Amino acid sequence: DTAIVLKQKVDAGEIVISENTHRLVEGIFDCQDLRVQSLKGITPPINAWRVRGERQTESRFDAQHGAGLTEFVGRGDEVELLLRRWERTKSGEGQVVLISGEPGIGKSRLTQHVRDRLANEPHTRLRYQCSPHHTNSALYPVVSQLSFGGGIAAEEAPSAKLDKLEALLTRGSADLQPISPLFADLLSIPYSGRYPALDLTPQVQKVRTLEALKDQLLGLASQQPVYMVFEDLHWID
């Protein structure tokens, strides 16, 4: 039957999904079409996909709208408010805006539209995606953003990951020696061949990591304005 045929196409522990499920998650997960041919008593051919892993995207919004967006309509007052705050940011006054409301009203779309409006202005863009599945993972949005911003893939060798991490950190810091081990440890990247081990208590390491993150952000902001968005803030750790 169908289950037996699909079992022959995948290895133990792999995940196979249907066509309907694939349509819902194709922007979030990397899937391979199994191309199962017609079987006796089964018409048309089976449409099934093997899930190969999670796609590296900046946010849930980007994953769900990778194919493109419709024209942005309305929200003129909100857009103008955010752009006025951006002008104040460029003059050196840091701004914080909370966008709240029921799911589906267009909060992420609003921030995306403002981001598009800033496309021709010099700035640094940071987007942090909080998740209900990682509320117990310390600094998950930061870890995810660093991995995405540095183009660090899970399957890469530790040396390649460190190279990309260092390239990312140079954007906000001149001295990488004291901070690279902290960031590498945060991203679970082995670094023993390049940096000495951190001889710190967990509490001290936590404090220094937070300080390094703050200094990195300040370093970026000293060069040009930073447009930073936290998605689904209520799920932050």
Regions found by a protein language model. Name each.
Residues 1-237:
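Key residue(s) within conserved catalytic/signature motifs
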